[in-house]
Amino acid sequence: LDKLTYAGNLSTLVPVIDKQNFRFVKMDICDRKAVYHLFEEEHPDVVVNFAAESHVDRSIENPQIFLETNIIGTSVLMDACREYGIQRYHQVSTDEVYGDLPLDRPDLFFTESTQLHASSPYSSSKAGADLLVGAYYRTYGLPVTISRCSNNYGPYQFPEKLIPLMMMNALEDKPLPVYGDGKNVRDWLYVEDHCKAIDLIIHKGMVGETYNIGGHNEMANIDIVKLILKELGKPESLITYVQDRKGHDRRYAIDPAKIHSELGWLPETKF
């Protein structure tokens, strides 16, 4: 189910839309009555919550919708799971709940025991949702798992995100806006590797546990932009440095040792 907001794209479902075991429902996860009705119809065994407002800049402009979707929506889904009974509820989260790491300490990585220290309204809403999921596990015994991933990239990504935005602007010879000095570091994870990790957690992960999912692909934003320009044969003169984002996290880096050692997962796609 999906609300199909500005970033929704039904064409991504074309390969599966005619499958007998697939059904798409347009719905807002904050609509408790509609969600309960769907659960009563379908009686799902597993619920995976990918639904989220996820763009940091938009969360700075309007935090309210992030709190509604990311926290209230999560509570509605879990209440429905409690009401109708499920085998597993999985919460898809983000490494941004941990805050950031200093650039001069490449030896530091986020682990599952790293304290939550969110920097933006977006990451704060995701951290709040994670805490709520943990509370439903402890209070109600809801069979939950949580995954926290690094920055995703891949087919169909909405062009407000760094990689598709830079590619589209470069192809059209438009300026490529880079925040601050461009040295902010992100760990990149291919979307299919992410999905395989989630599938593994659902089937083999321990109830009540959190798993970090990282790609082992750390790179500064400016280096990614320059790489894109090189691959497309475009000049670096298209790069335009702009005022830095408020509260911009400096570095993200995930240690995925837990999911590797316990479940055998490793990213297959090199950045």
Locate the predicted segments by residue.
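Short, cationic motifs built from Arg/Lys/His that form the positively charged side of catalytic pockets
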Residues: 126, 148-151, 156, 186, ...
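Residues that form or flank phosphate/diphosphate-binding pockets in enzymes
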Residues: 8, 33, 157, 219-223, ...
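Short, solvent-exposed loop/helix junctions and linker helices
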Residues: 68-71, 122, 126, 156, ...
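Hydrophobic alpha-helix immediately C-terminal to the catalytic Tyr-X-X-X-Lys motif of short-chain
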Residues: 128, 132, 136, 166, ...
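Short aromatic-enriched loop/helix-cap "lid" or pocket-rim segments at secondary-structure transitions
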Residues: 10-13, 101-104, 157-160, 224-225, ...
